Swiss-Prot record:
EC numbers: 6.1.1.11
Enzyme category, top tier: ligase
Organism from which the protein derives: Arabidopsis thaliana
Keyword Protein biosynthesis: yes
Protein name, as recorded: Serine--tRNA ligase, cytoplasmic
Length: 451
């Protein structure tokens, strides 16, 4: 969430900056004034509580003095009792006022960076880079889609997966499992060489911690709830969530920064808002593996923006190593999630549909997440009036099943699929996956038959 001081003109800040950011997000501008009003109400109640406490201390001293003089203090004692009651009631008002303020504050997104293209429609994301040579079907070879290629190679069993796990369930099988592990091992090795520390996080999180890492809408549309003895928990939708909370309630000394983590995990998503989109094959599924870059920097100068460029370069170098054509887009302001000040997507080329599709999202969340999680910058000082928070960034390296789909389409041949050279050492030296089933083609009557 944002720093409440940004809403306070008396602190030398300009709330109009927040209003403008909200306009860029196509979100409520009125909420800024609502927060300013709630903040004033909360501080007024807090002032009243402080006044009660000062009065209580004053009365207590009077009681002590009267007792020393062995004089009657009963009237003053009655006043202290009334003060306690009034103070308790006012403290309840303070808690209520703060809860209302915090609830509103959490609805305001991060400040949108000036370089973000302002638009509401993702169709207008700004293309900033193209890499690689796009492949197209030729008269001699009609390129197949990833759904058909998975079936022809026999690398996943979606029929039995759906029978056992429900819609979009699947088994990775044989070379499919090996290819998935090859991507994981290549990705982790790739990041280790770039100074990243590997972390495999828990696959579920406590609700109170998840609430500090995920938006409210994600609980309904994305997260699976795990019930059992004790507190409710939620399955992670990305390693970003547990990595985000890894340093919760800690102070991080400047000498420790930057921190670079390579999170590897299975991920679980309900995908409630994606009915009818990519429901076949293994492109958009409820359970998948992902390697996530997660980095923490200091809040000063351009440290986090330089890290954003570094993380984006890592992703580009990874897909260049796989020789998959891609484009980089800057996401429009209206499509940013609340935490992101700026976000890039890397979209790779899928030849069968002749379109680019998202494989990577890379965001700078500045101090928005760290403030909620109380991950502070520097070292604790007893006399410090203001706290600084670290900046946190996240980026996909590879969601492996989705990357496999892209590899299959770009590396297909008439009789199978080549294995990218960088993955071959992780595949026992295999260089080619032959089709195990015969391709399906249309016969002269328009019906499908085996070739």
């Amino acid at each position: 969430m944002l720093d409440i001081n940004l809403f306070r003109e008396e602190k030398g800040n300009n709330p109009e900056i927040i209003r403008e950011s909200q306009r860029r997000r196509f979100a409520s501008v009125e909420i800024v004034d609502e927060i300013i009003k709630l903040d004033k109400e909360w501080r007024q109640r807090q002032f009243e509580v402080d006044s009660f406490r000062k009065e209580f201390n004053k009365l207590n001293k009077q009681v002590a003095q009267l007792k020393i003089k062995k004089e009657d203090a009963s009237e003053i004692i009655q006043q202290t009792e009334k003060n306690k009651q009034d103070s308790t009631a006012k403290e309840a008002e303070v808690r209520e006022a703060y809860a209302a303020l915090k609830a509103k504050l959490e609805q305001v997104g991060n400040l949108v960076h000036d370089s973000v293209p302002v638009d509401k429609d993702e169709a207008n994301n700004l293309v900033i880079k193209l890499w690689g040579e796009k492949r197209f079907s030729t008269p001699g070879l009609k390129l197949k889609n990833h759904v058909d290629l998975v079936e022809l190679l026999g690398i996943a069993d979606t029929k039995r997966g759906a029978e056992i796990a429900g819609a979009r369930g699947f088994f990775l099988k044989g070379d499919g499992l090996m290819l998935n592990q090859a991507l994981i091992n290549f990705g982790l090795t790739f990041l280790k060489k770039r100074g990243f520390t590997g972390l495999q996080p828990p696959f579920f999180m406590r609700k109170d911690v998840m609430a500090k890492c995920a938006q409210l809408a994600q609980f309904d549309e994305e997260l699976y709830k795990v019930t059992g003895e004790g507190d409710d928990k939620y399955l992670i939708a990305t390693a970003e969530q547990p990595l985000c909370a890894y340093h919760i309630d800690e102070w991080i000394h400047p000498t420790e920064l930057p921190l670079r983590y390579a999170g590897y995990s299975s991920c679980f998503r309900k995908e409630a808002g994606s009915h009818g989109r990519d429901t076949l094959g293994i492109f958009r599924v409820h359970q998948f593996e992902k390697i996530e870059q997660f980095c923490i920097t200091g809040p000063n100068e351009n440290a986090s923006w330089e890290m954003l460029d570094e993380m984006m370069k890592n992703s580009e170098d990874f897909y260049q190593a796989l020789k998959l054509p891609y484009q980089i887009v800057s996401i429009v302001s209206g499509a940013l999630n609340d935490a992101a000040a700026k976000k890039y997507d890397l979209e790779a080329w899928f030849p069968s549909s002749e379109t680019f599709r998202e494989l990577v999202s890379c965001s700078n969340c500045t101090d928005y997440q760290a403030r909620r999680l109380e991950i502070r910058y520097g070292q604790k000082k007893s006399n410090e009036q203001t706290k600084q928070y670290v900046h946190m960034l996240n980026s996909t390296l590879t969601a492996t099943e989705r990357t496999i789909c892209c590899i299959l389409e770009n590396y297909q041949r008439e009789d199978g699929v080549d294995i990218p050279e960088v993955l071959q050492p992780f595949m026992g030296g295999e260089t080619f996956l032959p089709f195990k089933a015969k391709p399906v083609v249309a016969d002269t009557k328009g019906k499908k038959s085996k070739a």
